[in-house]
Amino acid sequence: MPSNNLIKNALISVSDKKNIVEVAEKLIINKINLFSTGGTAQILKKNNIPVTEISDYTKFPEIMDGRVKTLHPKIMGGILGQKQKDQEIMKLYNICPIDIVIVNFYPFEKIKNIKKNDIDNVVNNIDIGGPTLVRASAKNYKNVIVIVDLDDFQSTIDSINNNTMNMEKRFNLASKAFEYTSYYEQIISQYFIEQNSLYKKTNNSLFPNEINFSFIKKQDLRYGENYHQKSSFYIEKNMCDSGTISTACQIQGKTLSYNNISDSDIALECVKQFTKPACVIVKHGNPCSVAVSHNILESYLSAYNSDPISAFGGIISFNCKLDEKTAQTIINQQFVEVIIIPEISKKAVKILQKKQNIRVLVTGKLQNNTVGLDLKKITNGLLVQEYDSHNIDYNSWSFVTKRSPTKKELKDSIFCWQVAKFVKSNAIVYGSDEITIGIGAGQMSRIYSTKLANIKVKDQGKNIIGATMASDAFFPFRDGIDEAASVGISSIIQPGGSIRDEEIIRAADEHNITMIFTKKRHFKH
């Protein structure tokens, strides 16, 4: 490895020129000669920073509107040259060794997102020279320091000054450089796959033959699903959407656990569906209670009182601003792991600070941005599907029984159907007045999910005559209808589609139960 005091030449070629003048000034202070391409060189010259333009060094002009400028043997030789091995050939062809390369790429992703359908404009922002410089520099990391993130510059220049720019630091920068080029190629590839499907008039762009995803670590977690499992939380690069757990800001509380994040995501995605003030309480991957009301306090109290036993140690999410009264009520009522809100009042913050262990996540404005792909890892494989969207197609619903639903029953059917989608299959949800009354989740047979919901109702001594039942999938037998009727259910919403649908409808008619077929299933495994 070359000594740090032999670092003499730096090549700068950046599309994003923010802070590049300050960077160049520090290199000059360290008596490092600068080489640069046209646009970057002009900015440096305007700021009275001495710089040699690449075209002056190579004796070959930038051509084709700047598309060809750094791809030259004197540049690539200066980067790929190994000083202990290639000195003679470099001297023969007057190749200057390049010790530092600072590069960032054309903003392909930004242009793609703004002008997705302007293919010529998007393609014109595919960087060719930049990735070539970076890959060459990273390959020759023993001789070249490569910087693709200016946040790394100050620590690098400090290491050079302190003569501590060791092999580990060089290798780490090279590793980061390859991550940068890999992600850049990935988003270009994905764009071409999408556009190729348009040319072919096919609908396969969502599921290409080869698929890659790029995530960055947001934080290490306390542990995984269990104490003996280590875990970390990774998020998508360059996210701009608010209103997700991935983009939420934790304003207080202990470090999040794997289960905290998983349950919080379910709670938040569920509560997003509602426009009126709503509260969702989640435990072990399932909503244990959900309520919608005219204000946040009433929605919380209704949700909590729906199943106070299960709410203990739960995750609570709201779709509206948390006020001081509701915050105080929560800490008076129960032990809670996480509270998720789009915004919070200053007084509510002070109240929750009395319980410093409570994790509080502020998401910003909520929006239904859960679109695209849903992934599930299996051993040596990955299952990929479209996300089960929140949209309800009322026009496809059918009233299949002799009695049609009342206005209240229809309102409760919509509410229960929205909740059922987030409950593990087999899922049964009882609700009335937009409050869940009993939830049967995760049983291997639908009848036992129904019985579980009945047990919860009976244990709490609730009178649920006139309540609504939602089932995430069809009823294979009439026993579920009879069981629901035994506690007073008056309306049922389900997908339909069983070979015994006629028998199921007759059973509902026998009990004077109104039934809606949605023609859409919501299994959740």
Swiss-Prot record:
GO molecular-function terms, A-Z: IMP cyclohydrolase activity; phosphoribosylaminoimidazolecarboxamide formyltransferase activity
Gene Ontology terms describing biological process: 'de novo' IMP biosynthetic process
Coiled coil location: none
Domain of life: Bacteria
Domain MGS-like: 1-148
CDD domains linked to this entry: IMPCH
Pathway: Purine metabolism; IMP biosynthesis via de novo pathway; 5-formamido-1-(5-phospho-D-ribosyl)imidazole-4-carboxamide from 5-amino-1-(5-phospho-D-ribosyl)imidazole-4-carboxamide (10-formyl THF route): step 1/1; Purine metabolism; IMP biosynthesis via de novo pathway; IMP from 5-formamido-1-(5-phospho-D-ribosyl)imidazole-4-carboxamide: step 1/1
PANTHER family in the cross-refs: BIFUNCTIONAL PURINE BIOSYNTHESIS PROTEIN ATIC, BIFUNCTIONAL PURINE BIOSYNTHESIS PROTEIN PURH
HAMAP family cross-referenced by the UniProt entry: PurH (MF_00139)
Notes on the domains: The IMP cyclohydrolase activity resides in the N-terminal region.
Name under which the protein is recorded: Bifunctional purine biosynthesis protein PurH
Lineage: Bacteria, Pseudomonadati, Pseudomonadota, Gammaproteobacteria, Enterobacterales
